[in-house]
Amino acid sequence: MGNPLFAKKPMSLLLAESAEAGTHSLKRTLGPFQLTALGVGAVIGAGIFVLSGLGAHYAGPGLMLSFVLSGMGCAFAALCYAEFAAMIPLAGSAYTYAYATLGELIAWIIGWDLTLEYAMGASTVSSGWSNHFIELLNMFHLRMPLWLAYDHWTALSTAEKEVARQIAISSDSTLVPGTQAFLDKVSSIMATPSPDLLQRAHELMNAPRIFGMEIGFNLPAFIIALVITAILVVGIKESARFNSAIVVMKVSVVLFVIGLGSRYVSVANWGSDWHTFAPMGFSGIGAGAAYIFFAYIGFDAVSTTAQEAKNPQRDLPIGIIASLLVCTVLYIAVAGVLTGMVHWQDVNIEAPVARAFMDRGLSTASHIITLGALAGLTSVMLVMLLGQTRVLYSMANDGLLPKKFFAAVHPKYRTPYKNTILVGLLAAIVGSITPIDDIGRMVNIGTLLAFVIVCIAVMVLRHTNPGQARPFRTPWVPVVPILGILFNGYMMYKLGWVNWARLIIWLVIGLVIYFAYSRHHSRVSNPDRVEIPNP
């Protein structure tokens, strides 16, 4: 008998589970358009409305090439995902694929790792959604207390920046807010914080205290995560309709940005040669690509809905590849408009697209873009939470998590409601108390690891099951998977040792859970184990 740690889930069992249509199975209601919309909904959001600003400061007008490079890395992984999604149409995404090819331990690791992409990704996006919601309130001259608008650390940093602005204005009446000289003065004040600055910042927060520490709780992030959770509990069909409506809205806003913004593009801003187009050279373009990778996270969530697709063998590859193509084209176009409207050195980092239009005097357009960003981030949260709950559902059905809880299907809505509520609550809490930057970097490295494992798994399964029917085949194997491994592995390397350390700690926690519970309850490693059916 082989090592149970590397026991593989037989393809025959996977295909039998795919064909099974029992009382407690998920409803098959999603077609190719809805699956593509889910993918677009997961991808378009923080990247196009927020991260393009910082990417421009690395790559200059070459940001367009940064999106191409980042998209290529995702495309290699997407082609591998598409082969698995068509061949193994089960909820679970990379987790299920790893179980069939690399064994149970690796499958557990990737399932645990996917929590970084989906649940923590939803937390990241809920915090970003909150920032745009607060910006929307500001447009109507409404203010939230800082301690209810941000987590503690972000609230204090925001208060310090606001006080620094006040000090800059009072110290030099010639400074004009918004100019580079003003911003430099504010940065100088914050770089050498004085007792007066810190005291006034704490007064501005005006937050209640627990055990002597000021409270910081991002209330909008908490509420929006719970609202999305409630929508997911009601049902996948209703969730898909809600998501499709939002996707139509935000794609319309993106097309609006491209159409109107192109009228204000100055070709001179793109530069006249390679050195002005890519002021930091190819290394700057590569750095921009690594940073904006978050912009592409989410397309793989389409594969987690395999058991809810009407014709998964045909529709899942369409949904995965079409959503990635649509998003890449839109990203490149927006990057071109952004760096054409504003010189790359003047691109705003916090709200680059909206600010570019505001600086042109197009305030109404800027407001529309802010609303589009809110819609975009809402749909990203929906798809990420959806993906997480379906991965947990698959792991529970395999015995790696308690089935009575994580695979419990609502008798009316036919959704895994218990694990949906748990995941939504955890995402809401993390998003409301944790700085967005810290979660975002963890999401990046976790997602890249999943991509690398899927690329490896395609090559393994081609060797171990060469005769298996494949409705969609990844082209040019092993070239495409190897390129996916190299490209995504390089971006993992660029994320630095701190994030590697965080990833290792997270995986160690997962391994403790596996050896304490999962390996003893696994259906594959313990085929004679008697299961108690779900009520």
Show where each model-derived region lies.
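Membrane-interface "cap" regions at the ends of multi-pass membrane proteins
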Residues: 1-52, 57-61, 75-79, 88-91, ...
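Helix-loop-helix junctions that connect adjacent transmembrane segments
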Residues: 14, 21-27, 63-64, 143-221, ...
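Select transmembrane alpha-helical segments in multipass membrane proteins
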Residues: 28-39, 103-116, 221, 279-292, ...
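Membrane-helix boundary/coupling elements in multi-pass transport proteins
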Residues: 49, 113-131, 291, 296-310, ...
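Membrane-interface loop-to-helix entry segments
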Residues: 130, 213-264, 320-321, 440-453, ...
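C-terminal membrane-solvent junction of multi-pass transporters and transport-like membrane proteins
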Residues: 213-216, 228, 404-417, 451-500, ...
